[in-house]
Amino acid sequence: MSAQPAHLCFRSFVEALKVDNDLVEINTPIDPNLEAAAITRRVCETNDKAPLFNNLIGMKNGLFRILGAPGSLRKSSADRYGRLARHLALPPTASMREILDKMLSASDMPPIPPTIVPTGPCKENSLDDSEFDLTELPVPLIHKSDGGKYIQTYGMHIVQSPDGTWTNWSIARAMVHDKNHLTGLVIPPQHIWQIHQMWKKEGRSDVPWALAFGVPPAAIMASSMPIPDGVTEAGYVGAMTGSSLELVKCDTNDLYVPATSEIVLEGTLSISETGPEGPFGEMHGYIFPGDTHLGAKYKVNRITYRNNAIMPMSSCGRLTDETHTMIGSLAAAEIRKLCQQNDLPITDAFAPFESQVTWVALRVDTEKLRAMKTTSEGFRKRVGDVVFNHKAGYTIHRLVLVGDDIDVYEGKDVLWAFSTRCRPGMDETLFEDVRGFPLIPYMGHGNGPAHRGGKVVSDALMPTEYTTGRNWEAADFNQSYPEDLKQKVLDNWTKMGFSN
């Protein structure tokens, strides 16, 4: 197999990070028990380079190295989203809007089916169920109060509907349970949950399953996106990248995995057995010690892997890691598309990182809004009904409506508009009879039902934006001064002694 581009091969992606000077290779021994995750967490909180741990304590027979923070932010504003851009064959300087447009591009294209190849790098090594013990692998303990060692934070579950018409790729956390089992979170409305329910209804056998780590970066991005039910991600990724993904058949079931995957676990997802799962330090920045529940149980029958394999790891928590840059951002992209499909005048959507991606700010074309002859109350209700009753809005609990003057990709601009234009209560509509996201602390550990309600549309449009247009100017550099004076200030900025 010839060398593949970075967006189609995880190993090439790691090399691309090195070329970008966005990789730190750590060759000294690092303990997977908290130390690797602590370094990665510090990277996420400082937007530093991605760490590649080449010498994990407990490595054996090439299993495995760890790459931390594969989709987190870079320090420089010029290429802040460069790691995500590398997932999609975009320039490292791509904006978030360009990244999300790329992710949405395939929704209007015919899928490009994958190409089945006889073998691939993921078949370079293999272990059957008598040759491995998951508890002896260098699986990271990511937070000190986690309920177990979470092997699955950035891998891709692969399951198929019983009739074979829908193959789903998704990310859902999973931890080591014993020598050949994992337990994980499988909850509605996840696609893996939907397919699990189909197999349970048939009741004939457990769900054939694979978990692939270090998959093509474009594939892991698609796996994070709330694309419509029944859509097979392999074809979506093909359309998005313009090339057919190469897949190989699993050894122990009839599923197919990306040929360049770093590590593949093959087995089954039980339709009857469960096991203790959690707690885990999740995307909203909290862990609740002792908060263990029964989770879905996976049986691992075989492991195949590349030489000197690399396991990607997300050290989830407070800002900013992959759960924010990908889960929140991609939900917002799908919400933008959903609103436009429902003839709502939304031009942009983004989940502000400052909200721990529990909000999505919606930029409204106010000229089209005025043509609708609607009211704030009516518009709030219509937007909330569309978004909160759709899978794309599942993880989002506040929609903030803003005008054309607000850049939704700048959190400080969204917070300014929300704080100064939305009157609490009067300019808001609550939604209590919709599906809620129990992982948000105020849902799962607060007042009220964990799985219902707790959602709101907050209107940060001023009343005149519905009628005659803006009647104010921002008291800022851009709007409070003449163009010639602004240019003079900028031309002389460094000469006056200010930093560039």
Curated annotation (Swiss-Prot):
User: What gene is this protein a product of?
Assistant: fdc1
Give the residues annotated as active site: 282 (proton donor)
Q: What does the sequence similarity comment in the record state about its family? A: Belongs to the UbiD family. UbiD-like/FDC subfamily.
Entry's localization field? Cytoplasm
Major localization listed first in the record, in broad terms: cytoplasm
| Designated name of the protein | Ferulic acid decarboxylase 1
- Which GO cellular component terms, listed alphabetically, does the Swiss-Prot or TrEMBL entry include? cytoplasm
A Pfam family that this protein carries is UbiD_C
Note the effect listed for residue 282 to Q.
Answer: Abolishes catalytic activity
Q: Which InterPro entries match?
A: FDC-like, UbiD, UbiD-like_C, UbiD-like_N, UbiD_Rift_dom
| Note describing how the cofactor binds | Binds 1 prenylated FMN per subunit.
**Which residues hold prenylated FMN?**
168-173, 190-191, 233, 391
- Residues noted as binding Mn(2+) in the record, renumbered to the chain: 168, 191, 233
**Care to name a GO molecular-function term for this sequence?**
manganese ion binding
Q: How does it assemble?
A: Homodimer. May form higher order oligomers.
In terms of HAMAP family, this protein maps to: UbiD_FDC (MF_01983)
EC identifiers of the protein: 4.1.1.102
Q: Which UniProt keywords apply?
A: Cytoplasm, Decarboxylase, Flavoprotein, FMN, Lyase, Manganese, Metal-binding
According to its UniProt entry, the function of this protein is described as: Catalyzes the reversible decarboxylation of aromatic carboxylic acids like ferulic acid, p-coumaric acid or cinnamic acid, producing the corresponding vinyl derivatives 4-vinylphenol, 4-vinylguaiacol, and styrene, respectively, which play the role of aroma metabolites.
Asked if the Swiss-Prot or TrEMBL record annotates the protein with the keyword Manganese, the reply is yes
Swiss-Prot/TrEMBL catalytic activity:
(E)-4-coumarate + H(+) = 4-vinylphenol + CO2; (E)-cinnamate + H(+) = styrene + CO2; (E)-ferulate + H(+) = 2-methoxy-4-vinylphenol + CO2
Q: Name one GO biological process term.
A: cinnamic acid catabolic process
What cofactor does its activity depend on?
Mn(2+); prenylated FMN
Asked if the Swiss-Prot or TrEMBL record annotates the protein with the keyword Thylakoid, the reply is no
The top EC class, named as a word, is lyase
